[in-house]
């Protein structure tokens, strides 16, 4: 049970985050376009990307290279511009070939490369100090696959920074039409991934400090939206993530005082340890606010703190505000864009039943999306903006464990 949710990508869902496969060809006359729900907040959303190079750190996955990352910054805009791609084109190409395997459809059935987000590329910044939220994706999953919740937060006045963890994810596109694909050392590599993610996120925080001071941390010093650094309120930073990204967010909450609150979306906290009690994050706990959001049964029971020992120990060792929310009929990928994408694909072709069961389960998709777009902003509103939320009444398809 210990790592089943973090490593699910390597099992039933592996092709959705897989490497490029040989012999790909497409004879699809009219590819299916991606359609995602629009954000509901009052602000248009803008986005830009940055290439970050950590000159102080060698890459643990590829010796002899400095660690480099790609991040996206989503922010409240004053007006919408031409929409940014859903995924960078080279990333979309790699991801699409893997997705075709999982969906049992020819490559090209879905137009991943042409898909658009709901954010304007380099849109003008809406002035005003904004709380900042980091997002870390699951193991092997591109940062763009959480666009629904990310755009929702940005439309409600947050600056959201999404991070690709290079060489762990299926493919990361860098400037100059360069892509770095998944490059993992021989197993076991769980501890390496955990410590690397933690260092990645701390480096991103340092880079945001540079940006707020007026510097441009992009390695190529590409143009950024005017005034982007001026809206970063680095005294109000939260973090959230899915699967391994949820673990990374809680690691950061416990160890880095810059993080004031965090959400873990279905990520077990004992990753890399035979006994979850040995994980420093679990053993230490926190006095800062956190929200656990777990899925339904994959194994002995639902993912909640009474069932998952790593969640239970962390819960017992933590003394601050805490909530445990479960989606009983959802599954591990109900917390990211698959919850909307898979029902959309079902309109055009048959999606394998096993894939549905292992990714989003049987929960009503619209209700799960409603819950995600309610509880994530509500949590950060309460703890970064001092806007209380009533946590006593669960929405449909959700259950409060504690």
Language-model segments: residues:
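Alpha/beta-hydrolase-fold serine-hydrolase catalytic core, especially in secreted/extracellular enzymes
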Residues: 32, 37, 55, 329-402
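N-terminal export signals
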Residues: 6-26
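Short glycine-enriched nucleophile-adjacent loop
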Residues: 246-255
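Domain-level recognition of soluble alpha/beta enzyme cores
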Residues: 27-132, 354-365
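Alpha/beta-hydrolase active-site loop
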Residues: 181-230
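Gly/Ala-rich beta-loop-alpha elbow adjacent to hydrolase catalytic centers
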Residues: 241-245
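The feature captures the conserved acid-bearing segment of alpha/beta-hydrolase catalytic domains
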Residues: 261-332
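Short substrate-entry loop that stabilizes the transition state in hydrolases
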Residues: 125-130, 139-171
